[in-house]
């Protein structure tokens, strides 16, 4: 009897030891950066011709650290329903959370539900991680190894959201490495209005590097879904006052790394110390720009950059200028202000603002390639 108990104890010890070794292998292998690759459906649906669509937020990614913390790249959000659709809000909860591995189980703390999401680890290799989410569904991730160009640097990054047929946030956010940042919340934000804020150089660098992982200069100018009434995000990168690159993404069709970067930035304003910006202009947006009665096309983030320059320009005594461009500014109640400009000086309501350089010549909007 004692011999049997002794053998059972040895066998149990071996099992525990094996499990510990398995955990150690998984704990070591999981460290690094992983992006979502695809779903694998184990059991066919009744209608295999109609595979389930990939949820927008399913295209995610994680950065697992050895200290049992991880980054959920898009960040966790919570929907707060108001009394009316206008009062609905999305609150950003952060992107840093905890994880733990027990045997072949991976648990990730969900900041929205305050519960642990549970996955079975099917395998982790040097470049692929396969997790089982449900009995019928596997999630496959690929390991990333980004080489970030240290010589690619920007002074400002602008993210703008156009809204959709629903409650998608409408906003513009300009973050600056050296100057004050600017946020304009128009609708469906937890704060609406025009605000200034400061961000640290470390935070700017973190956001910049996140975007740089998508190889900014190699991205197309526009990505578009065939569906209607979706949200459009535009992102503009500025260096030495010049627009280096603008990428527009309608319906979340841009590469995953780029999309995850702007999703996180969409709610950055909720983490900043926003200060009400004094309204020194009779308009809070620019809706139209023309040259010789011909409209010039701008992405939303680009036109917000011009608004930012006007807001921070130097006001001079009014004088006559050679009018080359005509702009229309719009106030809170859509009241219209006509603005005349030669590219550097902007005249409206007997006021003159100097932005310090010729905005249109520097960026050559009339010869731009929109493809």
What are these model-predicted stretches?
Residues 1-30, 34:
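Bacterial Sec-dependent N-terminal signal peptides
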Residues 22-32, 36, 101-103, 108-165, ...:
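Short, well-ordered, aromatic-rich surface patches in folded extracellular/luminal domains
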């Amino acid at each position: 009897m004692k011999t049997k108990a002794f053998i059972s104890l040895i066998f149990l010890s071996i099992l525990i030891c094996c499990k510990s070794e398995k955990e150690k292998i998984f704990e070591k292998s999981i460290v690094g950066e992983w992006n979502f690759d695809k779903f694998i459906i184990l059991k066919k649906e009744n209608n295999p011709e109609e595979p389930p669509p990939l949820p927008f937020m399913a295209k995610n990614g994680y950065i697992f650290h050895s200290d049992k913390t991880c980054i959920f790249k898009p960040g966790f959000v919570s929907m707060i329903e108001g009394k009316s659709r206008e009062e609905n809000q999305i609150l950003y909860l952060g992107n840093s959370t905890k994880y733990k591995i027990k045997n072949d189980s991976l648990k990730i703390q969900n900041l929205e539900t305050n519960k642990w999401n549970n996955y079975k680890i099917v395998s982790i290799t040097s470049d692929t991680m396969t997790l089982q989410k449900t009995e019928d569904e596997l999630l496959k991730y690929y390991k990333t190894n980004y080489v970030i160009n240290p010589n690619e640097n920007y002074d400002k990054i602008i993210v703008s959201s156009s809204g959709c047929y629903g409650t998608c946030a409408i906003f513009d956010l300009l973050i600056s490495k050296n100057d004050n940042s600017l946020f304009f919340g128009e609708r469906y934000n937890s704060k609406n209005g025009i605000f200034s804020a400061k961000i640290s150089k470390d935070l700017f660098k973190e956001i910049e590097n996140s975007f740089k992982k998508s190889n900014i200069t190699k991205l197309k100018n526009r990505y578009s879904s065939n569906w209607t009434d979706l949200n459009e995000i535009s992102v503009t990168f500025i260096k030495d006052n010049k627009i280096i690159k603008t990428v527009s993404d309608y319906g979340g069709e841009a590469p995953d790394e780029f999309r995850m970067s702007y999703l996180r930035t969409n709610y950055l304003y909720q983490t900043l110390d926003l200060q009400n910006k004094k309204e020194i202009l009779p308009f809070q947006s620019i809706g139209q720009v023309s040259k010789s009665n011909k409209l010039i096309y701008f992405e939303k983030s680009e036109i917000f950059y011009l608004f930012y320059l006007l807001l921070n320009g130097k006001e001079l005594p009014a004088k006559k200028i050679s009018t080359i461009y005509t702009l229309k500014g719009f106030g809170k109640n859509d009241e219209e202000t006509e603005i005349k400009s030669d590219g550097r000086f902007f005249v409206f309501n007997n006021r003159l603002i100097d932005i310090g350089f010729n905005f249109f010549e520097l960026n050559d909007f009339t010869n731009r390639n929109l493809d």
